[in-house]
Amino acid sequence: MKRIPILVDKKYSGHWFDQKKAIRFDSNLSGMDWLSDFHEAMYLTKSNTWIWNEFTFGNDGDVDSDKYFKSDENFASKWLTRHRVDIQNYEEVPQTVKDSIEKIVSKMEV
């Protein structure tokens, strides 16, 4: 399944697209909704927007992303998912996570 990352300003809602479905979600951190059979987790970028992609979650709520992502993506996605309610802007993200996010964003076609 082809995943298309969408840049979404955090003031607005966004859509996740595959070849057959469009899923609307709330891009507000504190109001994050889990929809359909897909689970969404977030990335933060320098422009303080969200990039959303599909993840699967284990019973403990941690991201089981090894089969989707390489080391940088795995590290950043796990950290951001665990702290998603606590992070209000990019400045609060630790530098090690920012470095991983930058590598992810640089590889994405948006």
Predicted features and spans:
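Polar low-complexity intrinsically disordered regions enriched in Ser/Thr and small residues
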Residues: F17, W34, G61-D64
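Mixed-charge, Lys/Arg-enriched low-complexity segments
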Residues: T56-V110
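Short, charged/polar N-terminal "headpieces" of proteins
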Residues: M1-S27
